[in-house]
Regions:
Chain B
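Acidic/histidine-enriched, glycine/proline-rich intrinsically disordered or flexible terminal extensions
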Residues: 230-249
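A generic structural-conservation signal
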Residues: 30, 206, 226-227
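GST-like fold's C-terminal all-alpha helical module
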Residues: 108-215, 219
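GST-like domain detector, emphasizing the conserved glutathione-binding G-site
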Residues: 1-137, 244-245
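Residue-level recognition of oxygen-bearing side chains
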Residues: 74, 209, 222
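Short, hydrophobic secondary-structure boundary micro-motifs
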Residues: 86-91, 114, 176-180, 224-228
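Positions that flank functional sites
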Residues: 35-37, 182, 232-233
Length: 255, 249
């Protein structure tokens, strides 16, 4: 019996952040899988939980929480288990700086590429009238615009070029940080790593020319170390699509 | 001495950090810089990635030992940890989540809108040399050349109207402060909205609770002390390029 329910999609990007934090913390939770590609997140039963229709959301007793990074900080503070934020206030600042940088600068670039190559094509074959109705149900105007762009393949070449530029730079920044420290924000594994892993675990596959054992040995070391953790294995076992199965590429040995 | 704070006029992120430091009684060595002239990009400041790639754009920089820290809400969290004054974050984890989620909304939706409107109203004169981030440099160029997109400005005004409505609703139960007790959420919300009264007056035509909240805020000694550091009559009218408007819309 648990009083925690997590509404999530694949262990990937925003959904995967609170999932992995809960596994690392050892918190039992009811997993409520929402199929993003089937627009489950905009159906009335979920909108009753999170009226904005964004994924993930978590309930703890009668409390409802949204915003994946803020949920992770809550998970860390509200439950017993290993500490997932560093003890030192400067290191805590660095963990938050990196999570914001990933959430607002690097992740949107990755997701623009991901939506154009995966999400868009995955839903495009649905009946157009049904798709249009599904988009009309999306509560946030920003998300309606994004879905229309993804489905119509309407990201401009300039937008895609800018996203690829940021991905290239971002991989360099991650490598530079992981040259300096064992983990992303400090000497301890924590929320910044959980956040980063959800963004980066498939980079060696999606950006092989930029992220590999030769060019970014520290990113590869970091990804393999996180993949080796039991919590990560348990979390990714909740994946249902090829998206989550990409994680198996981290089973490879360093070249 | 616990750190060196490079800061601009007490508006936007510089305001949040100055007021948080005074609230917490943290004795910082203050080094005022002209953000609009591009001082933040000079060799006088350290330039690690956290300074050059800060999402916040032209915000303050706090140097503690050999670490240079940016992003005002997280600097305020740091000051809350090390200072001796009353807490500026709730202790309860759920209340703390509410505060961080609120600040995230301000950071992601309100701040880019306010910065876009502020820069359009008072554009900087030249693009400073030495900007490491190409996307921040592009925001500078747009600001200097008055290239603001009319659709984005209209959307930004809508975001300010919505933010004032959200605060008005949050205060509807008669509370004094956004999270109940005074917190970083009050500072960060005021930081970006103070200059919007002149630029988006329609947002404030029916906002009696917001007006009273702002008056309470200005009456706090730490806030008055921060605002008192201004070297111009209207610090809320001074803007340099801030966070970018979400590329997804």
């Amino acid at each position: 019996m648990t009083d925690v329910t997590l509404y999530h999609w694949e262990p990937n990007a925003n959904s995967g952040k609170p999932m992995l934090a809960l596994f690392e913390k050892g918190v039992a939770f009811d997993s409520h899988y929402l199929d993003l590609l089937n627009f489950d997140q905009h159906r009335p039963d979920y909108l009753a939980v999170n009226p904005l229709g964004t994924i993930p959301a978590m309930t703890h007793g009668d409390k409802v929480l949204t915003e994946s990074t803020a949920i992770m900080e809550y998970v860390n503070e509200a439950f017993d288990g290993p500490r997932l934020m560093p003890a030192d206030p400067v290191d805590q600042w660095r963990a938050r700086w990196w999570m914001k940088f990933l959430d607002q600068w690097l992740a949107p670039s990755f997701s623009m590429i991901g939506w154009s190559v995966f999400v868009g094509p995955s839903v495009r074959q649905k009946d157009p009238a049904e798709l249009e109705a599904a988009i009309d149900r999306i509560p946030m105007p920003e998300r309606r615009t994004a879905w229309r762009k993804a489905i119509n393949g309407a990201f401009s070449p300039e937008e895609m070029t800018e996203s690829q530029r940021r991905v290239g730079l971002g991989i360099g920044y991650l490598e530079a940080a992981l040259v300096q420290r064992e983990w992303l924000a400090s000497g301890e594994y924590g929320l910044a790593d959980i956040n980063g892993f959800n963004l980066a675990y498939a980079m060696p596959l999606s950006q092989p020319q930029l992220c590999n054992d030769e060019l970014t040995p520290n990113i590869m070391r970091w990804l393999r170390a996180i993949y080796a953790r039991p919590a990560t294995r348990a979390c990714w076992a909740l994946g249902r699509t090829d998206l989550a199965r990409r994680i198996s590429l981290l089973e490879s040995e360093p070249a | 001495m616990t750190g060196i704070l490079y800061h601009g006029q007490p508006n936007g992120p510089s305001f949040t950090v100055l007021a948080a430091a005074f609230e917490k009684g943290v004795d910082l060595e203050r080094r005022p810089i002209d953000l609009v002239a591009g001082d933040r990009h000079s060799a006088a400041l350290p330039h690690p990635i956290e300074v050059d790639q800060s999402i916040e754009g032209e915000g303050p920089v706090l140097v503690v030992g050999d670490v240079a820290m940016t992003d005002s809400v997280f600097l305020a969290c740091y000051l809350d940890d090390i200072g001796t004054g009353p807490a500026i974050r709730p202790a309860d984890p759920y209340a703390r989540w509410q505060m961080m989620a609120w600040c995230r909304y301000v950071i992601e939706r309100v701040a880019p809108a306010a910065a876009a409107l502020g820069n359009a109203a008072a554009p900087p004169h030249t693009v400073p040399a030495g900007i490491a981030s190409a996307d921040l440099a592009a925001r500078w160029t747009d600001a200097v050349e008055g290239e603001a997109d009319a659709t984005q400005l209209a959307d930004s005004r809508t975001k300010i109207v919505q933010a004032v409505e959200k605060i008005e609703a949050q205060l509807a139960d008669g509370r004094d402060w956004l999270m109940g007790d005074f917190s970083i959420a009050d500072l960060e919300s005021f930081a970006w909205l103070a200059g919007m009264r002149a630029l988006v007056p329609q947002a404030f035509v029916a906002s009696p609770r917001v007006d009273a909240w702002e008056a309470r805020l200005r009456a706090r000694p730490a806030v008055a002390q921060a605002l008192g550091l201004a070297t111009v009559p209207n610090p809320e009218a001074i803007w340099a390029p801030g966070p970018e408007i979400n590329r997804w819309g």
